[in-house]
Regions:
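Juxtamembrane helix-loop-helix connectors linking adjacent transmembrane helices
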Residues: 1-53, 60-66
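Small-polar-interrupted transmembrane alpha-helices in polytopic inner-membrane proteins
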Residues: 9-10, 40, 44, 68-85, ...
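Functionally important transmembrane alpha-helices
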Residues: 94-157
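Alpha-helical membrane-inserting segments
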Residues: 7-19, 46, 50, 79, ...
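Membrane-interface helix/loop boundary segments of multi-pass membrane proteins
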Residues: 50-75, 107-114
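Membrane-interface helix caps and helix-loop-helix hairpins in membrane proteins
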Residues: 21-27, 83-92
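Hydrophobic alpha-helical transmembrane segments
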Residues: 2-3, 34-38, 42-50, 70-75, 92-99, 155-170, ...
Length: 170
């Protein structure tokens, strides 16, 4: 799960940097803020894990037991997207992307039979976005990050706008 998110966010960051959608600058950090940033990872696992246990570990499996797997993935993924509707900067594209990520998470759960892999993917995704790369995380800024991200100009569907990378077509 960790590797999946590292690759996903690494590709997104590379595309942003190379295409000029945005740029990254390494922050000058002393040991104290660096340890603080590294120490945030377990909290992202807890946050992402809570969402995954509720929408995939519980809801998806209950619906699949009563109906069928495609419907269970569709419903749990849609609920996952709906849970983000109140976030700052939310757009149709950002919710669609979150629903699609929910489908990926549902498939990962089904094919690996491991909620822990899905929790690791979700928590790492959020952590890398916010505390490593300096992106907004579903419309919320991180207090501290290894890199600072500066958004270039362009339409929100390309840059992600105020919602962050999850609101982009990339």
């Amino acid at each position: 799960g960790i590797m999946i998110s590292l690759v996903q966010m690494g590709v997104i960051a590379l595309v942003y940097q190379v295409s000029g959608i945005g740029s990254f600058v390494l922050n000058e950090l002393s040991l104290e803020p660096l340890f603080f940033i590294l120490g945030l990872f377990p909290f992202w696992l807890l946050q992402g894990g809570t969402e995954e246990v509720a929408t995939r570990g519980w809801l998806l499996t209950r619906i699949a037991a009563r109906t069928n797997l495609p419907l269970a993935i569709a419903i749990s993924s849609s609920l996952f997207g709906i849970l983000h509707l109140g976030n700052s900067g939310v757009t149709f594209l950002s919710v669609l992307n979150i629903i699609l990520d929910g489908v990926l998470a549902g498939l990962l759960l089904v094919y690996t039979d491991s909620i822990w892999l899905v929790v690791a993917q979700h928590g790492t995704w959020n952590y890398v976005q916010g505390n490593l790369l300096g992106f907004q995380v579903s419309g919320t800024g991180a207090d501290a990050s290894i890199f600072s991200f500066t958004m270039g100009s362009g339409p929100d569907w390309l840059t992600g706008g105020a919602f962050g990378a999850e609101g982009s077509i990339i």
